[in-house]
Amino acid sequence: MSNVWLLSWNPDKWNWKEYSAWCTGTKNKEKFTESWTCRSKKPSVGDEFFLIKQGERPRGIIGHGHIVRESYIAPHYDAERAKKGDWPNHVDAEFDWLLNYETEAFLDQDILKSLFPSQQWSPQGSGIRIREEVAPQLKKLWDNMKSSEGRIPK
């Protein structure tokens, strides 16, 4: 059984310029690949990931995809940190579905915490493993949410 990972994004810390376009593109079955910070070195090609939006509310899972390149070291996305030698682990993440948290339904973090209290939903770094007992239920919830296009109520 492959692992499922939780990658994170905080818009307050990184301006993801392609975000809106990618949200639209994935609805047209386009896939997009980005180098993503991942504190674990264990993700393998083919592993699934979910993307959780952090920072200011709303927070929650807004994306899904697969790892297409295993762990490698690359400069930090913050140029100043990279200049100081901060070169964290990365993976290449291929997004197959990305939601615009300002306009679309997504899996709210508070609901996730309530449904799956054993899982960490506010990681201090991107790239933690989703617990084996949580992953299948999370996938089902994600698929149901996508197909109904309705936000799970708070």
Model-based region annotation:
Residues M1-V45, K113-S114, I130-E132, P136-K154:
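Compositionally biased, charged N-terminal/linker segments
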